Amino acid sequence: LQVKLMKKLTSVLLGAALIALTPCAAPAANPIKVMILDGESGGTYHKWQLTTPVLKKELEETGLFQVDVATAPKAGEDFSNFKPDFAKYQVVVANYDTANWPDDLKASFESYMKNGGGLVAVHAADNAFGHWPEYNKMIGIGGWRDRDEKSGPFWYFKNGKLISDDTPGRAGKHGRRTPYQLVTRDASHPIMKGLPAAWMHQGDELYNSLRGPGEHMTVLATAFSDPANAGSGHDEPVLLVTSYGKGRVFHTAMGHDVNALACVGFIVTLQRGTEWAATGKVTQKTPANFPTANSVSYRNDIAEMDPLYKNGLNGLDAQPGAGRGPARPGAVPAAK
C-alpha cells in the first residue's frame, strides 16, 4: 500500500497515530554505553540483519545512548576470537538466539551481570540458551530450545495474580502475527510509570507457554493469548524485569520483525527498559503519541527500514490484519 492510502485507512479505521519522522534528541554529555549483540537466530524467521539497525536507531534517537554492535559467529563456527569486553558497556541488548556458547564466554557474561551489568532480552533472545541455567535465571522465562518442566514452571496471570504452573510440557508457542492489547501489571515500576493501564501493540507474535525459574522476577505487562489463534487462554507475560546478582534485566517478548519494532509502544518500552537496565532509573517521558487501549501508534519511518515494506501483507501470515502495514485490531479480549 502507498503511504497516503495507509494513512487514510489507519485514520478512518483505527485512529492510530502515524509519524513520518521523529527527530533525534541532542546527545547526552555522558551517554549510556550499549552493546547490541546479534549474529545468530534459530531460523530465517528472525532476521537480525534487518532488526539490529532498527534497534540501534531507536536507542540512538533518544540522545541517551552510544551504541555499538557485536556480531557473534554463527553456531558451529570458531569463537576463539570472539571475546567481547562486556565491562565496557552498561547494558547489552540481545537481539540474538543461539543454542550455546563456549564455557569461557558464558563465565565472562555471568561475571559481568553479577557485578552490575545490564541485559535487555528482545523477543528471540528468550529462545536462546535453553540449557544454560544462569542465562535462564537472567531472563526469568523462555521458550523453545528443549525447554520443558525441567526448566521451571509455566508463568501466567490468572484473576490478577501471577501463577506458576508445574504442568509438564514443552515451552514456547505462538499464533499468527496480529495486534494485541497489553495490560499493565506494575504501574509503579520506572519502566511503566506514566504508561496507560492498557494499550495496543502493532501486529506481532504473542508468545505463550513460556517457562523458567522466574527468580527475582516482576511481570510488568501481559497480553491475553487467544485460543482461537493457537493461544493458551491465559494472560501471558510480555514485559518483565529480573535481577541477577547486582545486574538488572529487562525482557520484552515483543519484536518479531521490523513491522513490530515500528510500534511506538515497543519503541518506548525498549528505550525506557534499556535505560533502566543500565542505570536503575528512567528519565524519559511518555510521548503524546503512545498507543491507547483501542488503537496502535505506528512509525512509518521505522517500518520503511524493512525492504519488504512495500509488499504489503506479510506472506508468513496470510490473513488480513496480521502482516505489514497498519494493524487492524478487532475486539480486544478483557484481561483476566
Model-derived features: positions:
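Short, Lys/Arg-enriched N-terminal segments with co-localized hydrophobic residues
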Residues: 1-5
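Signal peptide processing junction and immediate N-terminal pro/mature segment
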Residues: 24-28
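Helical hinge/lid and interdomain linker segments adjacent to catalytic or ligand-binding clefts
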Residues: 29, 33-36, 40-129
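Extracellular ligand-binding/catalytic regions of CAZymes and related secreted enzymes
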Residues: 29-32, 49, 61-62, 71, ...
